[in-house]
């Protein structure tokens, strides 16, 4: 019996949360009847007019779903931000929404001016002590289950793993909780818990990313390494020590980011700012190191065409000469050293000024 009560309590809570975030789209029953709204307080319910009276065609039709959406947006945003949520009512203009709001305000003021009796008022129910005790018990049970799951997640996070979830929690407080997306605000100050399936999915993504990175760094060095015939026949020592430097990792990231859609950390930072609509000072320092900023620019340049740059005649002649020299030596092919060595000056040669490059990237 207690388990069934707890299950229904959780279902009721989840339903309230779904209605709060999704509003009229959550599938709850319609609470309003369709009607025709007119600026002169013509507010007739559909089907309630007398058979002999012709219904006026003047007015705006509001169905139940539109009314549910209207009142939900009014409670979440306010009427002063109607331009932000008007897209949720595609069949209504801003003036029609404001007209409906003013009509409701006049009806509310008129109702306050009259002495209202008890007729038609909803019945007030008083909760018994037994019901209050039951609700308190159910809420404490749900809280205990939630805290137990959080403790298990903390214990798993303290052990050594692929992902540092403590860093994720710190980022949530500093970054994600300040999102300006109206549909998900207000966000809690504490990081949302991750399920076990979500954790496993994230770890698989990290493993695939690391495998791709090792393929471009360690495997390339191992393939070009030569060993003696005696060492090749020996089966006692199976490991082959390989040193991977930071420069090799940076070159691999740049190469893979240009050849295919490999997400690098600086690019993920920018995508996060756009996805969560976060404000950040443009004159501030977005990346910690200069290498991360260069890596971001390289990844962006690989996904776009070259920015238009105004050049004079001397620069054009110089570039034509360089292109001719490159055409003469192109038949020899690119050597392995040229592919490994990424010259940053060549990547930014088309941008004469830093302001032009940044202005082009911000489009």
UniProtKB/Swiss-Prot annotation:
GO terms for molecular function: rDNA binding; RNA polymerase I general transcription initiation factor activity. GO terms for biological process: chromatin organization; nucleolar large rRNA transcription by RNA polymerase I; positive regulation of transcription by RNA polymerase I; transcription initiation at RNA polymerase I promoter. It is found in: Nucleus, Nucleolus. Its main location: nucleus. Signal peptide: none annotated. It comes from the Eukaryota. GO terms for cellular component: nucleolus; nucleus; RNA polymerase I upstream activating factor complex. This is RNA polymerase I-specific transcription initiation factor RRN5. The lineage of its organism: Eukaryota, Fungi, Dikarya, Ascomycota, Saccharomycotina.
